From Swiss-Prot:
The gene is MT-ATP8. This is ATP synthase protein 8. The modification N6-succinyllysine is found at residue 54. GO terms for molecular function: proton transmembrane transporter activity. PANTHER family: ATP SYNTHASE PROTEIN 8 (PTHR13722:SF0). The modification N6-acetyllysine is found at residues 54, 57.
């Protein structure tokens, strides 16, 4: 049974890891990061909904008068 030639495995694995490292560095370097992150100020808008304008009272069945 012939033996497997493993003499080129080291350089193949090393080249693969180096290539993956370079590709990942190039991908990460394309992202834009803010140098000073600040919270975004959002303006709260109050929407006028009909049931918020008028006062309504909700009666629970237990508080209704007996008939």
């Amino acid at each position: 049974m012939p033996q497997l030639d493993t003499s080129t495995w080291f350089i193949t694995i090393l080249a693969t890891i180096l290539t993956l490292f370079i590709i990942m560095q190039l991908k990460i370097s394309t992202y834009y990061y803010h140098s000073n992150p600040e919270p975004k100020t959002t303006k709260m808008t109050k929407s006028l909904i009909p049931w918020e304008i008028k006062w309504t009272k909700i009666y629970s069945p237990l508080s209704l008068p007996l008939r």
